[in-house]
UniProtKB/Swiss-Prot annotation:
Gene Ontology terms: cellular component: ATP-binding cassette (ABC) transporter complex; plasma membrane
Subcellular location: Cell inner membrane
Function according to Swiss-Prot or TrEMBL: Part of an ATP-driven transport system HI_0359/HI_0360/HI_0361/HI_0362 for iron.
CDD domains in the cross-refs: TM_ABC_iron-siderophores_like
Entry similarity comment: Belongs to the ABC-3 integral membrane protein family.
Protein name: Probable iron transport system membrane protein HI_0360
Chain ranges passing through the membrane: 17-37, 63-83, 93-113, 140-160, 164-184, 186-206, 223-243, 245-265
SUPFAM superfamilies hit by this protein: ABC transporter involved in vitamin B12 uptake, BtuC
One protein family per Pfam: ABC-3
Bilayer topology term: Multi-pass membrane protein
Keyword Transport recorded: yes
Length: 282
């Protein structure tokens, strides 16, 4: 029985997948805390779709996929900020326009040059078959993002919580928004290998949303989100070995189950908890 439970750890590809997924899940969850604070969940969705043309172009020209995806994500994020600043359109309309346009462009590129692009890897991810050079790329991305987040997390928090106060103390909202979108784009690129373009949105939203239901303090929220993101990613890869199922699907399903538990039973904001308190107060 013990041998069966430890079997996944005897394979190098499983160890690589579990370690890498844990790191990606943790850093994406850290960013999800800020998305919850600002109400920018849709932007995570936009970036997860917007990197597709960058990946397709990179594959077509035999370039590192991470390079193309990163610049496509940055271009999408800057486009959202620019269109929002010069037009009367609401933010959700701008986000919807950008991500649908970029995703359509990516599908067009794939259809024009289908042999150069592994569509399944883009859409669904392939963490179990990740190449060593991709591991190095993802490791560098995660390391740089983590260092920058640890250096600027307080400044980002102030920008997201109160821009007026941030300007008063000499911070530039535009600079820090660009920094955040750059980090988010980089982490989306890292998560592509784990869960694919479609499910990246869950990695950068669900842990933060779950933690948001459990606490009102940002620092605690971030810690809970990181733990949830890292643990579900590790366990998801582990379970997928026995299920012989899609790794990304298992990871996101676990995160969704934890969200539902928090949604129903959170001590302060849980649906059943609030209903019980309402009945007691009658």
């Amino acid at each position: 029985m013990l041998d069966l439970l430890l079997e996944p750890f005897s394979y190098d590809y499983m160890l690589k997948a579990m370690i890498l997924s844990t790191a990606v899940g943790g850093i994406c969850a850290f960013l999800s805390s800020y998305l919850m604070l600002k109400g920018w969940s849709l932007i995570g969705d936009a970036l997860s779709h917007s990197v597709v043309p960058g990946v397709a172009i990179a594959y077509a020209f035999a370039l590192p996929y991470a390079l193309g995806a990163f610049f496509a994500g940055i271009l999408a994020a800057l486009s959202i900020l620019w269109i929002k600043s010069i037009s009367k359109l609401k933010e959700d309309a701008v986000i919807g326009f950008i991500f649908s346009t970029f995703f359509a462009l990516g599908l067009l590129i794939v259809s024009l040059n289908p042999t150069a692009v592994n569509v399944q890897n883009i859409i669904l991810g392939n963490i179990l078959g990740i190449a060593d050079e991709d591991i190095y790329q993802v490791a560098i991305i995660i390391g740089v993002c983590l260092v920058l987040l640890l250096l600027f997390w307080k400044d980002l928090l102030l920008i997201f919580f109160d821009e007026t106060q941030a300007i008063t103390v000499g911070l530039s909202p535009l600079f820090y928004k660009i920094l955040f979108f750059t980090l988010l784009s980089a982490c989306v690129v890292a998560a592509l290998q784990t869960v694919g373009a479609i499910l990246v949105i869950a990695m950068v939203v669900t842990p933060g949303a779950t933690a948001y239901l459990l606490t009102d303090k940002f620092k605690t929220l971030s810690i809970i989100a990181i733990i949830l993101g890292a643990v579900t990613s590790f366990v998801g890869v582990y379970i997928s070995y026995y299920l012989d199922g899609a790794t990304g699907g298992v990871i996101v399903t676990l995160q969704t189950l934890l969200f539902l538990v928090a949604f129903l039973f959170s001590p302060k904001y849980g649906l059943l908890t609030r209903n019980k308190k309402a009945v007691e107060n009658v």
